[in-house]
């Protein structure tokens, strides 16, 4: 599901809100989540999961075009860990 599809689905379910209000709310939520992770903080949504940053160590990679070895710097990457309720719901739906 894309952000646009999420907004469309919410518009269909929340008929008392305008499409612009829903779009703004979704964008605000995502912006707040991104800025929280950017500042190094963790996000926990009970029953859904948590977002945090994991550090990837520097390593030697390979340029796929040339095959040359390339030094890759260490970096932080976003990580999502699903909560127990979400895992159970997904597994029961399959």
UniProtKB/Swiss-Prot annotation:
InterPro entries: Hist_DNA-bd (IPR000119), Histone-like_DNA-bd_CS (IPR020816), IHF-like_DNA-bd_dom_sf (IPR010992), IHF_beta (IPR005685). SMART domains: BHL. GO terms for biological process: DNA recombination; regulation of DNA-templated transcription; regulation of translation. GO terms for molecular function: DNA binding; structural constituent of chromatin. Gene3D superfamilies: IHF-like DNA-binding proteins. GO terms for cellular component: chromosome; cytosol. Keywords: DNA recombination, DNA-binding, Transcription, Transcription regulation, Translation regulation. This protein is one of the two subunits of integration host factor, a specific DNA-binding protein that functions in genetic recombination as well as in transcriptional and translational control. Belongs to the bacterial histone-like protein family. Heterodimer of an alpha and a beta chain. This is Integration host factor subunit beta.
